[in-house]
Amino acid sequence: MKMKKWTVLVVAALLAVLSACGNGNSSSKEDDNVLHVGATGQSYPFAYKENGKLTGFDVEVMEAVAKKIDMKLDWKLLEFSGLMGELQTGKLDTISNQVAVTDERKETYNFTKPYAYAGTQIVVKKDNTDIKSVDDLKGKTVAAVLGSNHAKNLESKDPDKKINIKTYETQEGTLKDVAYGRVDAYVNSRTVLIAQIKKTGLPLKLAGDPIVYEQVAFPFAKDDAHDKLRKKVNKALDELRKDGTLKKLSEKYFNEDITVEQKH
């Protein structure tokens, strides 16, 4: 009788363990249908909060992609330098926040096809007549967001380190610092600057042509699972380009199509 009771207890315990394993697999399958995406939530007009809701060009592009591949989105908001770290450690699947495709980043990540094109642009005070190109920045203090491709593009154009580059954790405060003379200039995406100058009404202007043009795409870790996911996203982007969604979203935010390669 005791042996029977013991057998029943063992079987019950095994069933409980198997049940738990089953639940774990179910949860994993649920997670397989979730795309973990990073953004700053402060990058107007690409990924920012409006009335407490995350929105912007990059956000809407990613939402359209997720709908095409039938996946849910889990957004994680961090400073840009922190986003790249989370992607590298596998805590994020990708980033939807104007990540430029660079040779350095391609060593670590696989990128999707580009969904936009960006130019690193200099912005100065409206009454500034001294700065017209990157050569005029020597001896000047120039703001840039830490870890951004725009900061790196500026550094690449300054091999002798004659430009004093002042880095910021976020975009917040950069334009005001230029307008109030606390820094001489600021570098960011041309489209971002056009939108921000219009939104803020600050006395600023673009100085010269963009110093670098780059593709913007979604980065993924270099492993089989993420490569499979990347290929799904590529297919979705092809469909969104073909049906006009990418162009429509671009014109909504910029009054121009930044999803096609710039001729320069």
Swiss-Prot record:
Task performed by this protein: Probably part of the ABC transporter complex YxeMNO that could be involved in amino-acid import. May transport S-methylcysteine.
One GO-annotated biological process of the protein: amino acid transport
GO annotations of cellular component type: membrane raft; plasma membrane
Compartment(s): Cell membrane; Membrane raft
Gene3D superfamilies recorded: Periplasmic binding protein-like II
InterPro entries: SBP_3_CS, Solute-binding_3/MltF_N
Keywords, comma-separated and alphabetical: Amino-acid transport, Cell membrane, Lipoprotein, Membrane, Palmitate, Signal, Transport
Membrane topology: Lipid-anchor
Identification of the protein by name: Probable amino-acid-binding protein YxeM
Induction notes from the record: More strongly expressed in the presence of methionine than in the presence of sulfate.
Lipidation sites (N-palmitoyl cysteine): C21
Similarity field: Belongs to the bacterial solute-binding protein 3 family.
Signal peptide interval: 1-20
Native source species: Bacillus subtilis (strain 168)
Major place of residence: membrane
Chain coiled-coil ranges: none
Assembly description: The complex is composed of two ATP-binding proteins (YxeO), two transmembrane proteins (YxeN) and a solute-binding protein (YxeM).
